């Protein structure tokens, strides 16, 4: 996923994660597309939650980028999109406590995503799951494979 030096590559990323049951065995999948090249990523965890898998997919996808990029990241997880675009600044200000004063759930993964996102310019887009978005369906299948291949 690289381009000639000088210009930041534009990368489209789709991510998904899930569990069956939730909590339980889970999987995540990601698709990275840059200049017509595609890279699929997937993995799983024997005991997790759907939210952890959604966050893991985003972290893994961003960590796979080898240089600063202009990224459009598509997710069907409102939890991921809202956390990264609306909630995290308050969490950081409150030393990783939510508005109720409790520790933020999945703090380790939120911190991992924020660190991986630093070198990039990212537009976080929400897509409705199972609504015909071909690449969203594709990463859903990757996440299922990640869970099944545990």
UniProtKB/Swiss-Prot annotation:
Keyword presence, Nuclease: yes
Coiled-coil ranges (or none): none
EC number: 3.1.26.4
Record-listed Mg(2+) 1 binding positions: 16, 54, 76
Gene3D superfamilies cross-referenced by the UniProt entry: Ribonuclease H-like superfamily/Ribonuclease H
EC category: hydrolase
Domain RNase H type-1: 7-148
Localisation per UniProt entry: Cytoplasm
Residues that coordinate or bind Mg(2+) 2: 16, 140
Keywords: Cytoplasm, Endonuclease, Hydrolase, Magnesium, Metal-binding, Nuclease
Cysteine disulfide partners in this protein: none
Substrates-to-products reaction catalysed: Endonucleolytic cleavage to 5'-phosphomonoester
Cofactors, names only: Mg(2+)
A GO CC annotation given for this chain: cytoplasm
Cofactor note: Binds 1 Mg(2+) ion per subunit. May bind a second metal ion at a regulatory site, or after substrate binding.
GO MF term list: magnesium ion binding; nucleic acid binding; RNA-DNA hybrid ribonuclease activity
Family label: Belongs to the RNase H family.
Protein role: Endonuclease that specifically degrades the RNA of RNA-DNA hybrids.
Summary of subunit composition and partner proteins: Monomer.
Protein name (Swiss-Prot/TrEMBL): Ribonuclease H
Naturally occurring in which organism (per UniProt): Gluconobacter oxydans (strain 621H) (Gluconobacter suboxydans)
Gene, per the UniProt record: rnhA
């Amino acid at each position: 996923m690289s381009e000639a030096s000088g210009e930041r590559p534009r990368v489209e990323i789709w991510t998904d994660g899930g569990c069956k049951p939730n909590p339980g065995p889970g999987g995540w999948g990601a698709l990275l597309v840059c200049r017509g090249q595609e890279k699929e990523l997937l993995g799983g965890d024997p005991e997790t939650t759907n939210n952890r898998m959604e966050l893991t997919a985003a972290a893994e996808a961003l960590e796979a980028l080898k240089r600063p990029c202009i990224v459009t990241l598509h997710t069907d997880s409102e939890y991921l999109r809202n956390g990264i675009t609306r909630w995290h600044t308050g969490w950081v200000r409150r030393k990783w406590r939510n508005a109720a004063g409790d520790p933020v759930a999945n703090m380790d993964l939120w911190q991992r995503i924020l660190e991986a996102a630093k070198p990039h310019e990212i537009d976080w887009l929400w897509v409705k799951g199972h609504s015909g978005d071909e690449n969203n369906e594709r990463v859903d299948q990757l996440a299922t494979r990640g869970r099944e291949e545990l």
